[in-house]
Amino acid sequence: MIKLCASSAVSARRLFGGLMMGMGLVGTSLLPTGAQAEIPYFEDAVAKGTLPPMLQRLPEHPNVIDFGAEGKTVGKYGGEFVTIMGRSKDIRMAVVYGYARLVGYDQDLNLQPDILEALDVNEEGNVFTLHLRKGHKWSDGAPFTAEDFRYYWEDIVNNDELFPVGPPRFLFVGDEPASFEVIDEYTVRYSWSRPNPFFLTELAATRPPFIYRPAHYLKQFHEKYRDAAELDALVQERGLRSWAVLHTDMDRPYKLSNIDRPSLEPWLITTEEPSDRFVFVRNPYYHRVDPEGNQLPYIDRMIFNISNSKLVPAKVGAGEVDLQSRILSLKDYTFLKQSEAKQNYQVRLWDVGAGAYAALYPNLTCSDPVWRDVIRDVRFRRALSLGINRTEINRVLFFGLAQPTNNTVLPKSPLFKPEYRESFIKFDVKAANALLDEMGLDKRDGDGIRLLPDGRPMEIIVETTGENPEHDDMLELIGDSWRKIGVKMY
C-alpha cells in the first residue's frame, strides 16, 4: 500500500514568479497557530454575520503550505492581480493559474494531495482510495463530501442524456470502466481489475477532469431531483432544448460561464459574459493556509482584461498589467526591456514546460511505400537532425538565449537522460551526408537534391498550423540547411 499525505509542494512559479497567491505549494495538514483574526477583505461580512469567521470556514485539517520549500516568506493580504487575455474564453485560465487539484505536482514532479487530505494506492496500482478533508466547503459554504463524487459518477457521466458516450477514457482500463464506491462521507474509492497509470496524472493535469461536482447546486437542474414541470419551465424560460442542455450550461467548471456555480478554486468569477473585463474575487472557503495559519490566497482580486492580442505587448510596455505570461513571445523581449526601468517592471525569461519550443515529426506511417521505407530508417532521421543548424536558429530567432536540444523530457524529470537531449543535435553536414550515402541515397538531380530509390527528388512537405510566425521562420532556416544535405523542404 502506498499512502500519499500532504507533505510537499505544488508550484505555479512559471506563471507567477514571486507573487504568493496561495497556489504555490502543497504542504502539511496540521493547522499552525498564530493566524491573524480575519482577512481584511472579509471583516465587514464577518462583523455583520453574513460570513463565518476564518477558522470556521477552513477544513478541520487545511492544507498548510510549506513556504520553506521555495524559500518564500509569509505575505500580506490585499491588492489585485491584473493581466491581459486575448479572448474572453481565456478566462478559463483562472483554473490553470489557481491549480486547485485533488492531487498536484510538487517541485520534483511528484504527486501530492492538495484538495484531498490523503490518498491510498495499492501496490498493484488499480485501487485508489481518496480521503477528503473534513469540514472542507464549497465557495457558498455547503459541505464538500463524497456525495459530490457520487453525483458526478452516477448522475452525470453515467447518464445517457448528459454523457451519451459515457465516462471519460481515463476512467477506463481498456474497455473496463471504474468501479466506484462511497466508503463514508469523506472517502471514495475507484478501482479496476488492472492498473490505471493515467488516473492520478489526469487529476493533476493543467485542465483537470473535475470528477466531483457541487451536487447540492446542480441537482436543481437534474431530472432525477427536480419536479418535471418546474424543470421544464426553467428549460423553456432559457429557450433551451432539454434539461440536459440546461444542466450542462449551469455546470461548466472549466469554461466558468456560470457565476453562481459553487467552486473550490482560490478565486471566484463574478463577471458575466459578454465583457472585456472579468473580475475574480477570493474564495472565503479556500482550503489552503500559510505556515502561520492565515487563509490563502493573499491577493483579494484577480482581473482579466480582454484585448486584441496584437496590442498586448504595447499595453504591457505601458505598465497596464501586474504580470503577463500569455501572448508575449521572445520577439517582444527587446521592446519590453526598453521600458523596464521607466515603467518599474521586470522582464523575466521563463523555462518552457515542453521538451522543445518546436519539433519535427517524420510520418512513420506514410502511405507512400517508398517514402515510408526511407523515413523508417533511423539513419535518415538522424541525418535530418544533424542537418539542422540549431545554433543559427538560436542566434537568429532567440537572441542566443535558447538551448539547442532534442524534444525530450525536462531535466527535472526522473526519466531525463542527457543522451536523449544531446544525441545528433550538432550541426554536421559531413556526417549527415555520410548517413544518407550509406543508405544508398547518393544520386542527385541537377539542383543537388537527392533522389529517392524510385528516382523522384527528395522533397519533404512540412505541415504546420501556420499560426506561429517563429515556427515559419524556423522552418525557413531549416530548409536552407537541409539543402546542404540534398533535401528540399516545402
Where are the regions that the model predicts?
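N-terminal short leaders/motifs
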Residues: 61-85, 130-143, 216-230
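Extracytoplasmic/periplasmic ligand-capture domains
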Residues: 15, 36, 40-44, 105-107, ...
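Edge beta-strand plus adjacent loop/short-helix module at the start
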Residues: 98, 141, 231-260
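N-terminal secretory signal peptides that target proteins for export/translocation
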Residues: 1-12
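Surface-exposed binding/hinge segments that line
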Residues: 169-246
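Bacterial N-terminal signal peptides
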Residues: 17-29
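N-terminal lobe/hinge region of extracytoplasmic solute-binding protein
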Residues: 47, 52-123
